[in-house]
Amino acid sequence: MVILLAEMTSSYSSQAELILRRLFEHAIFTADPMETIAEYLPEKPSSRVVIIGAGKASARMAEAVEYVWGKCDGIVITRYGYGRPCKGIEIIEASHPVPDETGVKATQKIVELMH
């Protein structure tokens, strides 16, 4: 009887682990800007588009915009280690949550770009 209970517990544990793993993977997939933003972007405007952004997910969002619209101008500030490859949008990695000199300079670049 002990062996049977151990097998049942092991089987239940494996099924629960599989369900939790699938839920986790689905949550990660649906939170990926490449999967969500791309679906909701309108057609690219015919006029100049400038993308600006800040935050940990902003570089991936910029990458998604360029995936759909092609090369765009812009600057995005993200946390160190969160940079993504973009064709035209400049991705600047800076400190978070406490700003560093790189973040301050990047913010100044955004202000200059918008003028």
Place the predicted regions along the sequence by residue:
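Non-transmembrane, aqueous-exposed alpha-helical and coiled segments at domain scale
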Residues: 5-115
